[in-house]
Amino acid sequence: FLPLILGKLVKGLL
């Protein structure tokens, strides 16, 4: 998993 995708997922959840 790329950091960009992970960040997007975290932002989407939050």
From Swiss-Prot:
Instruction: Please list the coiled coil stretches.
Output: none
According to the record, the signal peptide region is: none
**KW Coiled coil (keyword) present:** no
- In which domain of life is the source organism classified? Eukaryota
List-wise, which residues carry Leucine amide?
A: 14
Cell location: Secreted
Q: Which UniProt keywords apply?
A: Amidation, Chemotaxis, G-protein coupled receptor impairing toxin, Mast cell degranulation, Secreted, Toxin
**One GO CC annotation:** extracellular region
Q: In which tissues is it expressed?
A: Expressed by the venom gland.
GO biological process terms on file: chemotaxis
One GO molecular function term of this record is: toxin activity
Family assignment? Answer: Belongs to the MCD family. Crabrolin subfamily.
> What is the role of the protein in this entry?
Mast cell degranulating peptide. Induces the chemotaxis of neutrophils. Its mast cell degranulation activity may be related to the activation of G-protein coupled receptors in mast cells as well as interaction with other proteins located in cell endosomal membranes in the mast cells.
- Spell out the protein name for this chain: Histamine-releasing peptide 2
Q: Which organism is it from?
A: Vespa orientalis (Oriental hornet)
